[in-house]
Amino acid sequence: MTDLSTLRLSYTHGELRRADLNADPAQQFQSWLDAALRSGLREPYAMSLATADREGRPSVRTVLLRGIQDGGLTFFTNYESHKGHDLTDNPQAEVLFFWAEHERQVRAYGPVERLSSEDSAAYFHSRPRESQLAAHASDPQSAPVSNRAELETRLTALHERFAADQEVPCPEFWGGYRIQVQEWEFWQGRPNRMHDRFRYRRNDAGWHIDRLMP
């Protein structure tokens, strides 16, 4: 087995100074995300979403960021999934983006609210038809399924149920969430673990920025 304790990299890609930061953290995030997109990183809009149930048991998974609205981060999922139940019982979450090639990381935390059914349906109908059918087939998400064949059978039945020219309805159990971000952290890797870290915290005046110990 590889001795992981010997594996390390020196981060030399860049630096992050207070003077470089946008006063609006959502704009700062957008600039970093745009840089990741321009450089051709694979799915730089993928984020690790951490939630916790009513007992405080945490869970984490990867979801796709689907928009930035009024400084909030939006994503879509099955409301009956594990994360959906977590967010019903404990409507707060933290997400993390890590762009290894840029030696950058962003964390964002805040309370979570559901999007309107109209906004959820609009996004649902923008998705490929096969993805729309798959959302129906995989309900309830995270529930045990006996085998792959059962899942494929359900998808086949949905193809028969909805003709090719028939609109697939957005399920009531599926839709979007918005994280109303109250705290952001931007991390830039630096040599010898002397990283640059800045935290934005919302206050009555807007946003307060602190440099953090690495």
Curated annotation (Swiss-Prot):
What start and end residues bound the annotated signal peptide? Answer: none
Span list, region Disordered: 126-146
> Which example biological process does GO assign this protein?
pyridoxine biosynthetic process
The superkingdom of the source organism is Bacteria
**EC code:** 1.4.3.5
Which UniProt keyword terms apply here? Flavoprotein, FMN, Oxidoreductase, Pyridoxine biosynthesis
InterPro entries in alphabetical order: Pyridox_Oxase, Pyridox_Oxase_CS, Pyridox_Oxase_N, Pyridoxamine_oxidase_dimer_C, Split_barrel_FMN-bd
Cofactor entry: FMN
Instruction: Give the cofactor note.
Output: Binds 1 FMN per subunit.
Pfam families noted in UniProt:
PNP_phzG_C, PNPOx_N
Give the residues the record marks as binding substrate.
R8, L9, S10, Y11, R66, Y123, R127, S131, R193, M194, H195
One GO molecular-function annotation for this sequence?
FMN binding
Catalyses:
pyridoxamine 5'-phosphate + O2 + H2O = pyridoxal 5'-phosphate + H2O2 + NH4(+); pyridoxine 5'-phosphate + O2 = pyridoxal 5'-phosphate + H2O2
Q: In which pathway does it act?
A: Cofactor metabolism; pyridoxal 5'-phosphate salvage; pyridoxal 5'-phosphate from pyridoxamine 5'-phosphate: step 1/1; Cofactor metabolism; pyridoxal 5'-phosphate salvage; pyridoxal 5'-phosphate from pyridoxine 5'-phosphate: step 1/1
Residues at which FMN binds: R61, T62, V63, L64, L65, R66, F76, T77, K83, Q105, Q141, S142, W187, R197
Quaternary structure, from the entry:
Homodimer.
In the record, the note on similarity to other proteins reads: Belongs to the pyridoxamine 5'-phosphate oxidase family.
PANTHER family named among the record's database cross-references: PYRIDOXINE-5'-PHOSPHATE OXIDASE (PTHR10851:SF0), PYRIDOXINE-5-PHOSPHATE OXIDASE (PTHR10851)
* Record function comment: Catalyzes the oxidation of either pyridoxine 5'-phosphate (PNP) or pyridoxamine 5'-phosphate (PMP) into pyridoxal 5'-phosphate (PLP).
Name of protein: Pyridoxine/pyridoxamine 5'-phosphate oxidase
Q: Source species, please?
A: Deinococcus deserti (strain DSM 17065 / CIP 109153 / LMG 22923 / VCD115)
